Amino acid sequence: MADLSNTKLNYVTFNQDHSCLAVATSRGFRIYHTDPFSKIFNSDEGNVTIIEMLFSTSLVAMVRSPRHLVIQNTKRGSIICDLTFPTAVLAVRLNRKTLAVVLEEEIYVYDIGNMALKHTIATSPNPNAIFALSPMSDRSYIAYPMPKPREDQGERRPAHAPPLSEYVPPTSGALMVFDTTAGKAVNVIEAHKMPLCCIALNHEGTKVATASERGTIVRVHSVPEGHKLFEFRRGTIPSTIYNMSFNLSSTLLCVSSSSETVHIFRLASAQNANAGGAGPAALETPGSPRANRWSRSKSIDGSEYSPSGDSDSSPRGETPEAGPSGPSAARRQSGTFGSMLRRSSQIVSRSVAGAVVPYLPQSVAEMWEPQRDFASVKIPKPTNAGDALLGPCL
């Protein structure tokens, strides 16, 4: 990717089966094979802000100007469709039957076979394009934050004022699941207490992962039933979740956030994990690096323990960074009396939870002890943070 050294990156994303990588730049776009890594297509025509592929086909969807979407056949070099929208295009997703285009207050759903508009979905203001489309067309679901109707209809507004939108920003973490084949909403999942920050559907469209604005808890529900399957603890410090992605077999979930750490969670039941020696007891044996991480976790002033919701309740923090050694570092590690007291309290809380949780029903136990990641990676901070929008992280 040396040819991108002097080019501004606008958008980076994998295709639906992660076999290709598409890169949108200020000078066209590039498409790469991931295994083995090699460039398979290059275009230097104009500024491309968003690009999405349709599996490994030659069909790509591109945004070149804020309200302008182009569907192009890269093999023939021809434009298949040219669409203009009333407001800026914030996100685009495709599967073999559906094209979904996200605006700030609407989602346009097209039949990809003939590019006919099938549905227009009104949403709450969604400037961050929080939304997901399942890659498989057999179970074609769209997931997005549940719209909140406006209670104040603005009766006292002056006549010359523009009309108010139908919905207001959501105040809860409810998730709407829309079936694009049936053309209707099929379920509302109460995923979090706080508004949603990130949504991801797995390859088959049977699971949905969600994170709230707090970013400490990640939950996985079944689709369309809405049963909670997993609950994971990303960390204790609130953070913005940028992306989540399932692997193709839906056994792993990758989460990236503003903490500059990528967490990988294993989607396995507690019984299976313990049977395979990968449960919490096996992973966090005394003296292990993960167990030692507990004692080095960062404390939060004024935090309170709450066994449910998205509260900052877990004693576990982010992966510690390697710092300088010496007397000053030793003083920082020892901390104040207050931090030592908090660490002692956390250790006692963990001991109590470890003794009590095995005797509780599973639904209650997971509230006390959400599953942790089994791997995490600390990534370097980019020189120009925010220059590129990133697609799925796995």
Swiss-Prot record:
The keyword Transport applies. It comes from the Eukaryota. A motif (L/FRRG motif) lies at residues 232-236. Residues 331-342 have a biased composition (Polar residues). This is Autophagy-related protein 18. Residues 302-312 have a biased composition (Low complexity). The gene is ATG18. It holds the Pfam family PROPPIN.
